[in-house]
Curated annotation (Swiss-Prot):
Protein name per UniProt: Inorganic pyrophosphatase 1
Cofactor entry: Mg(2+)
Entry keywords, A to Z: Cytoplasm, Hydrolase, Magnesium, Metal-binding
Listed EC numbers: 3.6.1.1
Catalytic reaction annotation: diphosphate + H2O = 2 phosphate + H(+)
Gene: pyp-1
Region of interest: Disordered: 36-63, 77-118
UniProt keyword Magnesium, yes or no: yes
InterPro entries in alphabetical order: Pyrophosphatase, Pyrophosphatase_sf
Length: 427
């Protein structure tokens, strides 16, 4: 069975339409990818040969302006050739608006369809990367295989994704090289959150081997709210390995300290990546988010295997290829905490994106901070790794202990009842 899903968003007078055709074993929560690479080439495949996605943009003479119109789009049946799928419709919002353009049966059908996309687990070997480093190092290497190993239950606080390399369990933060190809400035990116999902995942920087886990607040797993017209995260979201935004350093251009995390990346390509995937990306620019008084860089990147990668070489190219996406990204980062009762986020540079050259200087700087961090005898974060320069060396015994402290991979925990709810933000 082939499913066809479409999400729609409006920005700057454009209707931005994204289409994803998925095999029944592939979804936004369970994409299985195999990536191989050399110094010059890389290919990506999924468990279904029919899997594809293309961004398309078109002007609309009548932009969507109200909830009824939008929900009509979201409840339209789409025949994919072998089955008809109802797309998800909104079921209320923070500010009262609820769709009335579809029947209750239609809304329930579409809600069930959307929920099925959230609940399929990753495979035990969900993502395998062939890159270039036999020996983990602080620079580019030359041949390695990584696979994602799940523990615990997805959507619960015991969920972990460990990364296994040729030496055994490794830290995706410390052991995967920053560069996939240093000469061409191609970086490795660890995917923490696939596009269109809501579960807020991150590398656990205080745990040995920094597995990916679900963020929590007051003992409850965190999910981002859907800010109209978006669904979950609107890009593949993750981080660059071997980087660190030093909280003891005030960034001169922003006037704020680093946020104590690896540097974040939004990958804007045409495919939904799997959680734990390691993508080869080129960086196009960066946005300087000021999050609760801290500098929180958001790098903009494109998978080098993407169909549009050759067209995207700097930040100005993004607007040409994906018109409206940068504006939507600023809007998303500004507003995503508002439904939780927090104020809107702020930005340095008035929310303007900096170009590729600027972004790469930021990356180089955060890489140097990371090199200093792993040499500290008493670091504030966990720096256990297999890189020779690290003071705290990782061992197979330590890895076995870390994994042994987590439960076996089990059934998914229930999703929150409001995970599909749309929230509307004014102003």
């Amino acid at each position: 069975m082939i499913l066809s899903c479409r999400s729609v968003a409006t920005a700057r007078g454009f209707l931005l339409s994204t289409r994803l055709i998925m095999g029944c074993a592939v979804s936004q929560e369970s994409a299985i990818a195999t990536v191989s690479s050399s110094s010059n080439t890389a290919t990506t495949s999924t468990s279904s040969s029919n899997t594809s996605q293309k961004w398309a943009t078109s002007r609309t003479s009548r932009p969507v302006t109200n909830v009824t119109q939008v929900s009509a789009i979201h409840t339209t049946s789409m025949d994919s050739g072998s089955s008809t799928v109802q797309l998800p419709s909104p079921r209320g919002s923070l500010t009262t608006a609820v769709s009335t353009s579809s029947s209750g049966a239609q809304r329930q059908m579409s809600a069930n369809s959307e929920r099925s996309l959230h609940t399929r687990p990753l495979s035990e070997t969900a993502v395998i990367l062939q890159s270039q480093a036999v020996k983990m190092s602080t620079g580019a290497g030359d041949s390695a295989v990584y696979e994602a190993v799940e523990r615990g239950s997805l959507y619960s606080l015991d969920y972990r994704v460990y990364i296994k390399g040729p030496q055994g369990i490794v830290s995706p933060w410390h052991d995967i090289p920053l560069f996939a190809n240093k000469d061409k400035r191609v970086y490795n990116m660890i995917v923490e959150i696939p596009r269109w999902t809501n579960a807020k995942m991150e590398m656990a920087t205080k745990e040995p081997f920094s597995p990916i886990k679900q963020d929590e607040k007051k003992g409850v797993a965190r999910f981002v709210h859907n800010i109209f017209p978006h669904k979950g995260y609107i890009w593949n979201y993750g981080a660059l390995p071997q980087t660190w935004e030093d909280p003891n350093h005030v960034v001169p251009d922003t006037g704020a300290k680093g946020d104590n995390d690896p540097i974040d990346v939004i990958e804007v390509g045409s495919k939904v990546a799997g959680r734990g995937a390691v993508l080869q990306v080129k960086v196009l620019g960066t946005l300087a988010l000021i999050d609760e008084g801290e500098t929180d860089w958001k790098l903009v990147a494109i998978d080098v295997n993407d169909e549009n990668a050759d067209k995207l070489n700097d930040i100005d190219d993004v607007e040409k290829v994906y018109p409206g996406l940068l504006a939507a990204s600023v809007e998303w980062f500004r507003n995503y905490k508002i439904p939780a009762g927090k104020p809107a986020n702020e930005f340095a540079f008035n929310g303007e994106f900096k170009n590729r050259e600027y972004a790469e200087k930021v990356i180089d700087e955060t890489n140097e901070y990371w090199k200093t961090l792993i040499k500290e005898a008493n670091p504030s974060l966990n720096t256990v790794s297999r890189v020779p320069e690290a003071v705290h060396q990782g061992t197979d015994e330590a890895a076995a202990t870390a994994i042994g402290a987590t439960p076996e991979h089990g059934a998914n925990a229930p999703l929150p009842g409001d995970v599909d709810k749309w929230h509307f933000v004014q102003g």
